[in-house]
Swiss-Prot record:
This is V-type proton ATPase subunit F. GO terms for molecular function: proton-transporting ATPase activity, rotational mechanism. It comes from Xenopus laevis (African clawed frog). InterPro entries: ATPase_V1-cplx_f_g_su, ATPase_V1-cplx_fsu_euk, ATPase_V1_fsu_sf. It holds the Pfam family ATP-synt_F. It comes from the Eukaryota.
């Protein structure tokens, strides 16, 4: 999970937070002072971890590193953009969703 404090705390309370064998957490709380570089590095490190199958990221944070997210083309780990308390979800900004929609025709969805 990469998100604001409320989002990450909610998922941690739900039991998804853990440390891997190298004592690295599977979450990042993004605060005002968190640099874009740190977010990018964390996202890239999550992509390379074999213990992570899904990366949940607040959409407003995904917008900060959109250029990195758009380069991710493999299905695992899946990247899901989620809303935060302060920022509602906007499907038009979700590049992963746009790519997925392009894979199917209307007949496939019937």
């Amino acid at each position: 999970v990469i998100g604001d404090e409320d989002t990450v705390t909610g998922f941690l309370l739900g039991g998804i937070g853990e440390l891997n064998k190298n004592r690295k957490p599977n979450f990042l709380v993004v605060e005002k002072e968190t640099s874009v570089t740190e977010i990018e590095e964390t996202f890239r490190s999550f992509l390379n971890r074999d213990d992570i199958g899904i990366i949940l990221i607040n959409q407003f944070i995904a917008e900060m590193i959109r250029h990195v997210i758009d380069t991710h083309t493999i299905s695992i780990p899946a990247v899901l953009e989620i809303p935060s308390k302060e920022h509602p979800y906007d499907a038009t900004k979700d590049s992963i969703l746009r790519r997925a929609k392009g894979m199917f025709t209307m007949e496939d969805l019937r």
